[in-house]
Swiss-Prot record:
Gene Ontology biological process terms in this record: cell adhesion; metal ion transport
Descriptive protein name: Manganese ABC transporter substrate-binding lipoprotein PsaA
Cited NCBIfam families: ABC_lipo_SloC
Binding, Mn(2+): H67, H139, E205, D280
Membrane-related topology note: Lipid-anchor
This protein's GO CC annotations: plasma membrane
Function: Part of the ATP-binding cassette (ABC) transport system PsaABC involved in manganese import. Binds manganese with high affinity and specificity and delivers it to the membrane permease for translocation into the cytoplasm. Also acts as an adhesin which is involved on adherence to extracellular matrix.
Keywords, comma-separated and alphabetical: Cell membrane, Lipoprotein, Manganese, Membrane, Metal-binding, Palmitate, Signal, Transport, Zinc
Organism of this sequence: Streptococcus anginosus
Keyword Phosphoprotein part of the UniProt annotation: no
Lipid sites, type N-palmitoyl cysteine: C20
Top-level taxon in the UniProt lineage: Bacteria
Protein's cellular compartments: Cell membrane
Length: 309
């Protein structure tokens, strides 16, 4: 009986060791980290750091609104299986219908162990509207300096989960942030050359506060955030009255919103819509703006061109 007990203990010990070994994700085991990102922007930044070292799933499809989303069965499955989950935080996926909060709770995932806010360390800007005052503005990625913070946070967690690929992640992070930094410096110089009376970026959603602070271009909008009413007659009237007091040459409309309210503003002010720009999503693969870097470059170029008219 004693011998049988000893054998049972040895058997269970072997099973435990095998289980631990099979669960380890590193280059030597041949297993890739299963990573989930909540939207296409975060997914693209992650891809630039991790390359082919991970299996990556992006939840909110390209072109859709990440503020309020209903996860599909595939999203639930991937989140449950994920080793690492990246979300924006600061009132994006956890505001509105709080879809991300419900998703990670159902998947039994733990904050700062399984899922991480890539915006950690960003200098947060707050909303101003009557119904939203005091809430965080989530659109931090529209300042390239914050995009670099996102990249560093992502690399940090990849290294923590997959230390065997540390050098790979660090090299990619260095190359990527240098590229973003160069674009950021070019943008600041570009906007310095635009006359002050033309410096006003007008969009449907008031998502350009971080952009405005970074590049010295004030912003105006129809509605403040996509979780409130969008394009009401009162909102449109307020913006039209403001624009009639300015010399702004161009308007802009985002790729992920209904363009009809901005078309009404354009008709009422005789200010043309210069371009569609990207805010909550990158473009579809193969199109201009299909990465975080190219999306930001496209936005910076189009906004500078439009305001220089």
């Amino acid at each position: 009986m004693k011998k049988l007990g000893t054998l049972l203990v040895l058997f269970l010990s072997v099973i435990a060791l095998v289980a631990c070994a099979s669960g380890k994700k590193d280059a030597t085991s041949g297993q890739k980290l299963k990573v989930v990102a909540t939207n296409s922007i975060i997914a693209d930044i992650t891809k630039n750091i991790a390359g082919d070292k991970i299996d990556l799933h992006s939840i909110v499809p390209v072109g859709q609104d990440p503020h309020e989303y209903e996860p599909l069965p595939e999203d639930v499955k991937k989140t449950s299986q994920a080793d690492l989950i990246f979300y924006n935080g600061i009132n994006l996926e956890t505001g509105g219908n709080a879809w991300f909060t419900k998703l990670v709770e159902n998947a039994k995932k733990t904050e700062n162990k399984d899922y991480f806010a890539v915006s950690e360390g960003v200098d947060v800007i707050y909303l101003e509207g009557q119904n939203e005052k005091g809430k965080e503005d989530p659109h931090a990625w529209l300042n390239l300096e914050n995009g670099m913070i996102y990249a560093k946070n992502i690399a940090k967690q990849l290294i923590a989960k997959d230390p065997s690929n540390k050098e790979f992640y660090e090299k990619n992070l260095k190359d990527y942030t240098e590229k973003l930094d160069k674009l950021d410096k070019e943008a600041k110089e570009k906007f310095n050359n635009i006359p002050a009376e033309k410096k006003l970026i007008v969009t449907s959603e008031g998502c350009f506060k971080y952009f405005s602070k970074a590049y010295g271009v004030p912003s105006a909008y129809i509605w403040e955030i996509n979780t409130e009413e969008e394009g009401t007659p009162e909102q449109i009237k307020t913006l039209v009255e403001k624009l009639r007091q300015t010399k702004v040459p161009s308007l802009f409309v985002e790729s992920s919103v209904d363009d009809r309210p901005m078309k009404t503003v354009s008709q009422d002010t005789n200010i043309p819509i210069y371009a569609q720009i990207f805010t909550d999503s990158i473009a579809e693969e193969g199109k201009e703006g299909d990465s975080y870097y190219s999306m930001m470059k496209y936005n910076l170029d189009k906004i500078a061109e439009g305001l220089s008219k």
